[in-house]
Structures are given as C-alpha cells and as structure tokens.
Amino acid sequence: MKHKYLIAVSGGPDSMALLNKKRHLVEAVCHVNYHDREDSDNDEKIVRDYCKKYNLKLFVFDTHKDDVSKYKDINNLQTWYREIRYDFFEKISQELGIKKILIAHQKNDFLESAYMSLNKNKKNLFLGIRRKSKFRSLILIRPLLNKTKKSLEQYCRSKNIEFVIDYTNFWDRYSRNVVRKMMAEWDKKTFQKFYLKVKWFNLKNMFFIKLLDSKFNNWIKQDFDINYFLKIKNNYKESLIYLFLNHIGIKPNENKIEQIIEFINKNKNGSVKKYRLKENQFIEIKNKKILYSIC
C-alpha cells in the first residue's frame, strides 16, 4: 500500500498537529490509554472524535481492558509504557501490513534527548533523535523535528484542533521532565545556540554514521553472522552492537554492549551458551549466527 502510514496519537498537541497535517497519508491511528491520569479517558475521546470526524481507522490499546500480564515483571514505569506501546504498534503493523509509523517527536524532544546524552558522558555518534529509524520490525518516521512544541500548540489553536496537556510532563519524578523544565526557562538565543551545537556535532559525524548504517544493513543481510562482525574494525563494533540491540527492541547501555562483545569473542566457535539480555530475553550463537530468543 503506497504512501500509507500508521500514526501514533496520544491526544497531545504534537501528535494532534501531526495527525492533522498528515491525515491524507494515514491508513490507521494507534492510541494507547495507560490510565495513568484521572483524565486519560479524555485523551482517548479527543482522538476518537477526530478520527470519527475524518473517517479514520482507529486502534486503541486500553491497559484496563487489554491483557498486560506479560509486562507484570517490568518495574520501571517508562519501560512498561514503551514495551506496551511498541508491542501494540507492531501488532497493528503486522495486521495491516504497514511497517512505517509516524511519531510526533518535535524539536524540544530532540534537544532534551541531546542534552541528556551529553550529561551522561556517553560515547555519542549522534545527539538527539533521528528523523528516521528502525525499531524491531517498525520504521519510525518523525516529520516534526524542526518544529517547536510551542509552534505546534499554536498550530492546533489556529486550526481549532482539540488537544490535551499532560500535566505529568511537569512532574520531577522523571529525569526528562527536569531537563524539560530547565530548557523551558531558556531564552531564544540560548535555545538556538544549543540547537546549532547539536546539529554541528551530528553533521561532523554524518560520514561515519552513514558508513556504520551501511555495515549494519550488510550484517542484517548476513543474518548477524559472527564472522562478519569479528572482521569489522574495533572502532565500529560497539556501535554495531548498539544498533543490533535497538533493532531487536532492547534499550542499549555501555555495560551491556561491552558484555555482548565479550560474549561473542568467547563463544565464536559456536557455543550454545546464552547471554541474558533482560528477564526472559536472550541471545545465543548457533551456526555462526547471533540468534535472539524469548523464553
């Protein structure tokens, strides 16, 4: 189905603006009701009303009605949200045969992510959020990365599009919210200066990133053959494992990346020993291939 997308819509100004801008390209709308706020049903109503008005197909995952038992061992709330959300998106993607999904991350989200990465002193090749990326079997597309949150709210008001403001975005219990509140106090000059710093950083690394993406795509085509990986120069290996983890839907961190490289080096002769990624998810090496499994 050419030029048709899924779209993730929360009911907030960012996703409602994106939906209104791209609805002619949308095959189906995906909404998750986490029931994490007293008024979360209002978010769903806003999305339902819009979809009804424009005759758009809507799929809703409701954590009070749908089965969430498989997530009971997840202790981190943000991880719980993410696993539910992307499992749901994948399910709808497979049902409709559409891999591309529009996500409403915007310029503020981009800079918040960049700031948090810099503060963690991580070995960064790219700061912020990519316009296009792969996650599990999905292709995520983010058309709003050059739009500020304020401009999207103004757009919704100018078009009389109803939206909801999630007050939990201002709670200090999440590190991103602390960064968000700090950046909200920046003047335009400070905001733009940091934005240009991030863009310049990414531009300097663009050649390496493109080369890395090419190598990773070749590795996918070879079904994650370990001989291909072992022949790669060491300065690419950490980044390839980062992309591998992201590809299978596991949040990467430096310790996990180092441990997986060590696991591959120790088991390159085809040991059936497994490496535990998290809970019931593992990788193992069989027939010189890295296999991912859920037990």
From Swiss-Prot:
Give the Enzyme Commission number: 6.3.4.19
Q: Which domain of life is it from?
A: Bacteria
- Any one of the GO CC terms: cytoplasm
Q: Could you tell me which SUPFAM superfamilies the record lists for this protein?
A: Adenine nucleotide alpha hydrolases-like (SSF52402)
- InterPro entries referenced in this protein's UniProt entry, alphabetically: Rossmann-like_a/b/a_fold, TilS/TtcA_N, tRNA_Ile_lys_synt, tRNA_Ile_lys_synt_N
For this UniProt entry, the molecular function terms from Gene Ontology, in alphabetical order, are: ATP binding; tRNA(Ile)-lysidine synthase activity
UniProt keyword Cytoplasm, yes or no = yes
List ligand-binding residues for ATP. 10-15
Catalytic reaction(s) noted: cytidine(34) in tRNA(Ile2) + L-lysine + ATP = lysidine(34) in tRNA(Ile2) + AMP + diphosphate + H(+)
Q: Broadest EC class?
A: ligase
Asked if Ribonucleoprotein is a keyword of the record, the answer is: no
Keywords, A to Z? ATP-binding, Cytoplasm, Ligase, Nucleotide-binding, tRNA processing
User: What are the BP-aspect GO terms?
Assistant: tRNA modification
Which cell locations does it reside in? Answer: Cytoplasm
Q: Name one Pfam family in it.
A: ATP_bind_3
PANTHER family named in the record: TRNA(ILE)-LYSIDINE SYNTHASE-RELATED
- Family affiliation: Belongs to the tRNA(Ile)-lysidine synthase family.
Supply the domain comment: The N-terminal region contains the highly conserved SGGXDS motif, predicted to be a P-loop motif involved in ATP binding.
Q: What does this protein do?
A: Ligates lysine onto the cytidine present at position 34 of the AUA codon-specific tRNA(Ile) that contains the anticodon CAU, in an ATP-dependent manner. Cytidine is converted to lysidine, thus changing the amino acid specificity of the tRNA from methionine to isoleucine.
According to UniProt, the name of this protein is tRNA(Ile)-lysidine synthase
Source organism: Malacoplasma penetrans (strain HF-2) (Mycoplasma penetrans)
* Gene symbol of the encoding locus: tilS
